[in-house]
């Protein structure tokens, strides 16, 4: 599995701000979007481009254009929504597929409850968004569903991840690509990433 931990100073700075205990909902939401944007910049580095000729202000000009790449952005409800706008800044024409999964707080097992996928998803590259890769259960379940519908070109964008979750993901889906801002220390007995930044869904939506 391709794993890319982005250590750019801007990424490290913004992630540090997200870890502040009493960060406001507004600021956490802004930073989630900004990191989604920065992760997308790196994750799309291998998109093919073609040279086309357009009419510019001074006549005909040759420009580069992304070559026929169909993309679907797949935020995992609900925390993945916080990253979505930042991703769409770079990919404004991407179609959006929604997958809803919640975690059983006792067993930590993922429980899918909703999905709405774009048409012809088997022809698209999917960019899965989830700010936290803890046990890996939700992301694994999402990829299972995407592959069930024939989508095998998958990239995962997470902000923080635990080594345990990365290992589980790699064992189940070694063919995907993972882009993240930080590989943190571990997950605790409650299934949260340490140091992490707490519950990303609650911090994004202002809930408890």
Curated annotation (Swiss-Prot):
Top-level EC class as recorded in UniProt: transferase
Give the UniProt record's GO annotations in the biological process aspect.
UMP salvage; uracil salvage
Molecular functions (GO terms): GTP binding; magnesium ion binding; uracil phosphoribosyltransferase activity
Sorted alphabetically, which InterPro entries does this protein's record hold?
PRibTrfase_dom (IPR000836), PRTase-like (IPR029057), Upp_B (IPR034332), UPRTase/APRTase (IPR050054), Ura_phspho_trans (IPR005765)
Keyword Metal-binding among record annotations = no
Q: What is its EC number?
A: 2.4.2.9
Q: List the disulfide bonds.
A: none
* Residue stretches in coiled coil: none
Report the SUPFAM superfamilies cross-referenced here. Answer: PRTase-like
Q: What pathway is this protein a component of?
A: Pyrimidine metabolism; UMP biosynthesis via salvage pathway; UMP from uracil: step 1/1
Q: Which Pfam families match?
A: UPRTase (PF14681)
Q: Where does 5-phospho-alpha-D-ribose 1-diphosphate bind?
A: 78, 103, 130-138, 199
Q: Its catalytic activity?
A: UMP + diphosphate = 5-phospho-alpha-D-ribose 1-diphosphate + uracil
Any idea what job this protein has?
Answer: Catalyzes the conversion of uracil and 5-phospho-alpha-D-ribose 1-diphosphate (PRPP) to UMP and diphosphate.
**Name of protein:** Uracil phosphoribosyltransferase
Q: Which organism is it from?
A: Blochmanniella pennsylvanica (strain BPEN)
Q: Top-down, what is the taxonomic lineage of the species of origin?
A: Bacteria, Pseudomonadati, Pseudomonadota, Gammaproteobacteria, Enterobacterales
């Amino acid at each position: 599995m391709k794993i890319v931990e982005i250590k750019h100073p801007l990424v490290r700075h913004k992630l540090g701000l997200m870890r502040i205990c009493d960060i406001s909902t507004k600021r956490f939401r802004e930073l989630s979007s900004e990191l989604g944007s920065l992760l997308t910049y790196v994750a799309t580095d291998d998109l093919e481009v073609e040279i086309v000729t357009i009419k510019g202000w001074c006549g005909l000009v040759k420009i580069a254009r992304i070559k026929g790449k169909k993309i679907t952005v797949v935020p995992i409800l609900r925390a993945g929504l916080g990253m979505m706008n930042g991703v769409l800044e770079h990919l404004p024409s991407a179609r959006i597929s929604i997958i809803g999964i919640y975690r059983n707080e006792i067993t930590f097992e993922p429980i899918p409850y909703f999905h709405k996928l774009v048409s012809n998803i088997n022809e698209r590259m999917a960019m899965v968004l989830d700010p936290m890769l803890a046990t890996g259960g939700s992301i694994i379940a999402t990829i299972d569903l995407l592959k069930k519908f024939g989508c095998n070109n998958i990239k995962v964008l997470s902000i923080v991840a635990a080594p345990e979750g990365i290992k589980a993901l790699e064992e189940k889906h070694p063919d995907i690509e993972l882009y993240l801002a930080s590989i943190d220390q571990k997950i605790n007995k409650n299934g949260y990433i340490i140091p992490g930044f707490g519950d990303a869904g609650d911090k994004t939506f202002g809930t408890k």
